[in-house]
Protein backbone atom coordinates (compact mmCIF):
# COMPACT_ATOMS: atom_id res chain seq x y z
CA UNK A 1 0.00 0.00 0.00
CA UNK A 2 1.36 3.41 -0.97
CA UNK A 3 2.04 6.08 1.60
CA UNK A 4 -0.39 9.02 1.67
CA UNK A 5 2.13 11.33 3.30
CA UNK A 6 3.39 13.82 0.69
CA UNK A 7 7.11 14.01 0.13
CA UNK A 8 8.43 17.51 0.93
CA UNK A 9 10.13 19.23 -2.00
CA UNK A 10 13.89 19.15 -2.12
CA UNK A 11 15.85 22.26 -1.15
CA UNK A 12 16.97 22.77 -4.74
CA UNK A 13 13.36 22.58 -5.95
CA UNK A 14 12.09 25.20 -3.47
CA UNK A 15 15.05 27.45 -4.21
CA UNK A 16 13.90 27.64 -7.83
CA UNK A 17 10.29 28.47 -6.97
CA UNK A 18 9.30 31.97 -5.98
CA UNK A 19 6.69 34.60 -6.67
CA UNK A 20 7.68 37.60 -8.73
CA UNK A 21 8.00 39.19 -12.12
CA UNK A 22 10.63 37.40 -14.19
CA UNK A 23 11.85 38.19 -17.70
CA UNK A 24 14.85 37.47 -19.92
CA UNK A 25 17.60 39.99 -19.15
CA UNK A 26 16.41 40.90 -15.64
CA UNK A 27 19.71 40.16 -13.89
CA UNK A 28 21.69 42.16 -16.47
CA UNK A 29 19.23 45.04 -15.98
CA UNK A 30 19.68 44.84 -12.21
CA UNK A 31 23.47 44.94 -12.69
CA UNK A 32 23.15 48.06 -14.88
CA UNK A 33 22.01 50.00 -11.81
CA UNK A 34 25.44 49.55 -10.24
CA UNK A 35 27.46 49.93 -13.44
CA UNK A 36 30.29 52.49 -13.41
CA UNK A 37 29.33 56.08 -14.16
CA UNK A 38 30.03 56.74 -17.85
CA UNK A 39 28.88 60.33 -18.28
CA UNK A 40 28.18 63.38 -16.18
CA UNK A 41 25.55 66.05 -16.42
CA UNK A 42 25.93 69.74 -15.73
CA UNK A 43 23.55 72.54 -14.92
CA UNK A 44 22.15 74.27 -17.98
CA UNK A 45 22.74 77.94 -17.15
CA UNK A 46 20.28 79.11 -19.81
CA UNK A 47 17.48 77.11 -18.17
CA UNK A 48 18.64 77.88 -14.65
CA UNK A 49 18.64 81.69 -14.72
CA UNK A 50 17.28 83.45 -11.66
CA UNK A 51 17.26 80.16 -9.79
CA UNK A 52 18.51 80.71 -6.28
CA UNK A 53 17.23 77.39 -5.06
CA UNK A 54 18.35 73.89 -4.29
CA UNK A 55 15.54 72.46 -6.41
CA UNK A 56 16.25 71.13 -9.87
CA UNK A 57 14.45 69.99 -12.97
CA UNK A 58 16.61 67.64 -14.98
CA UNK A 59 15.52 66.82 -18.53
CA UNK A 60 17.73 64.03 -19.80
CA UNK A 61 18.06 60.28 -20.08
CA UNK A 62 17.60 59.55 -16.42
CA UNK A 63 19.90 56.51 -16.15
CA UNK A 64 23.23 58.40 -16.18
CA UNK A 65 21.66 61.23 -14.17
CA UNK A 66 20.41 58.83 -11.50
CA UNK A 67 23.80 57.07 -11.47
CA UNK A 68 25.55 60.36 -10.79
CA UNK A 69 23.02 61.50 -8.19
CA UNK A 70 23.38 58.18 -6.38
CA UNK A 71 27.19 58.44 -6.53
CA UNK A 72 26.94 61.94 -4.99
CA UNK A 73 24.59 60.56 -2.32
CA UNK A 74 21.95 63.13 -3.29
CA UNK A 75 18.49 62.68 -1.75
CA UNK A 76 15.17 63.97 -3.10
CA UNK A 77 11.68 64.22 -1.68
CA UNK A 78 9.91 63.96 -5.05
CA UNK A 79 10.84 62.15 -8.24
CA UNK A 80 8.68 62.33 -11.36
CA UNK A 81 9.43 60.12 -14.34
CA UNK A 82 7.61 59.89 -17.65
CA UNK A 83 9.16 56.84 -19.32
CA UNK A 84 8.34 55.64 -22.83
CA UNK A 85 4.95 53.93 -22.80
CA UNK A 86 6.13 51.10 -25.09
CA UNK A 87 3.34 51.75 -27.57
CA UNK A 88 5.49 51.34 -30.67
CA UNK A 89 4.46 54.79 -31.92
CA UNK A 90 6.96 57.19 -33.50
CA UNK A 91 8.06 59.94 -31.11
CA UNK A 92 11.20 62.06 -30.65
CA UNK A 93 12.39 59.42 -28.19
CA UNK A 94 12.32 55.66 -28.57
CA UNK A 95 8.90 54.31 -27.62
CA UNK A 96 9.18 50.79 -28.94
CA UNK A 97 10.98 48.44 -26.58
CA UNK A 98 9.39 45.37 -28.08
CA UNK A 99 11.67 42.73 -29.48
CA UNK A 100 11.84 42.52 -33.24
CA UNK A 101 8.93 40.61 -34.77
CA UNK A 102 11.10 37.69 -35.91
CA UNK A 103 12.40 37.25 -32.35
CA UNK A 104 8.97 37.13 -30.73
CA UNK A 105 7.68 33.76 -29.68
CA UNK A 106 4.43 35.26 -28.52
CA UNK A 107 5.30 34.86 -24.84
CA UNK A 108 4.40 37.71 -22.54
CA UNK A 109 7.87 37.93 -21.00
CA UNK A 110 9.64 38.31 -24.33
CA UNK A 111 7.11 40.88 -25.52
CA UNK A 112 7.89 43.25 -22.65
CA UNK A 113 11.36 42.19 -21.49
CA UNK A 114 13.38 44.90 -23.20
CA UNK A 115 11.15 47.63 -21.78
CA UNK A 116 11.32 46.09 -18.30
CA UNK A 117 15.11 45.87 -18.61
CA UNK A 118 15.20 49.58 -19.44
CA UNK A 119 13.01 50.45 -16.43
CA UNK A 120 14.50 48.29 -13.67
CA UNK A 121 17.90 49.97 -13.22
CA UNK A 122 16.29 53.41 -13.30
CA UNK A 123 13.82 52.49 -10.57
CA UNK A 124 16.54 50.88 -8.43
CA UNK A 125 18.58 54.09 -8.66
CA UNK A 126 15.50 56.24 -8.05
CA UNK A 127 14.95 54.28 -4.84
CA UNK A 128 18.54 55.04 -3.80
CA UNK A 129 18.08 58.80 -4.19
CA UNK A 130 14.53 59.03 -2.82
CA UNK A 131 14.25 60.20 0.78
CA UNK A 132 12.50 57.84 3.22
CA UNK A 133 9.50 60.20 3.28
CA UNK A 134 9.64 60.82 -0.48
CA UNK A 135 7.24 60.11 -3.32
CA UNK A 136 7.88 58.85 -6.82
CA UNK A 137 5.33 59.67 -9.48
CA UNK A 138 5.37 57.62 -12.68
CA UNK A 139 3.31 58.51 -15.75
CA UNK A 140 2.61 55.42 -17.79
CA UNK A 141 0.07 54.27 -20.37
CA UNK A 142 -2.08 51.19 -20.41
CA UNK A 143 0.45 49.10 -22.37
CA UNK A 144 2.82 48.83 -19.40
CA UNK A 145 0.81 49.88 -16.34
CA UNK A 146 0.60 46.34 -14.91
CA UNK A 147 4.32 45.68 -15.40
CA UNK A 148 5.21 49.09 -13.99
CA UNK A 149 3.23 48.38 -10.84
CA UNK A 150 4.91 44.97 -10.40
CA UNK A 151 8.41 46.44 -10.83
CA UNK A 152 7.62 49.36 -8.50
CA UNK A 153 6.34 46.89 -5.88
CA UNK A 154 9.52 44.85 -6.23
CA UNK A 155 11.86 47.83 -5.93
CA UNK A 156 10.01 49.98 -3.39
CA UNK A 157 7.85 47.37 -1.63
CA UNK A 158 4.13 46.72 -2.01
CA UNK A 159 3.36 48.70 1.15
CA UNK A 160 4.75 51.88 -0.38
CA UNK A 161 2.04 52.17 -3.03
CA UNK A 162 -0.06 55.25 -2.25
CA UNK A 163 -2.50 55.23 -5.14
CA UNK A 164 -3.10 55.51 -8.85
CA UNK A 165 -4.04 58.85 -10.36
CA UNK A 166 -6.08 58.61 -13.54
CA UNK A 167 -6.68 61.37 -16.03
CA UNK A 168 -9.23 61.35 -18.81
CA UNK A 169 -7.75 61.26 -22.28
CA UNK A 170 -8.80 63.99 -24.67
CA UNK A 171 -10.35 62.90 -27.93
CA UNK A 172 -11.54 59.48 -26.80
CA UNK A 173 -14.57 57.92 -28.41
CA UNK A 174 -18.20 58.42 -27.58
CA UNK A 175 -20.24 56.21 -25.29
CA UNK A 176 -21.98 54.78 -28.34
CA UNK A 177 -18.78 53.22 -29.69
CA UNK A 178 -19.02 49.68 -31.06
CA UNK A 179 -16.31 48.41 -28.68
CA UNK A 180 -15.08 49.40 -25.24
CA UNK A 181 -13.54 52.86 -25.21
CA UNK A 182 -10.39 53.57 -23.22
CA UNK A 183 -11.09 56.89 -21.56
CA UNK A 184 -8.20 57.21 -19.16
CA UNK A 185 -4.48 56.68 -18.91
What residue ranges belong to the model's regions?
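A general structural signal for short secondary-structure junctions and capping/turn motifs
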Residues: 48-49, 128, 178-181
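Conserved Class I SAM-dependent methyltransferase catalytic core
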Residues: 110-166
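DnaQ-like (DEDDh/DEDDy) 3′-5′ exonuclease domain used for proofreading
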Residues: 1-81, 85-121, 125
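Short secondary-structure boundary/capping segments
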Residues: 73-75, 93-99, 151-157, 179-183
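Conserved nucleotide-binding/hydrolysis micro-motifs of P-loop NTPases
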Residues: 84-88, 142-145, 169-172
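Short, solvent-exposed loop/turn and secondary-structure capping segments
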Residues: 88-96, 148-150, 164, 176
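Polar, glycine-rich mid-to-C-terminal structural blocks
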Residues: 170-171, 177-185
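A generic secondary-structure signal marking the coil-to-beta-strand transition
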Residues: 54-56, 163, 185
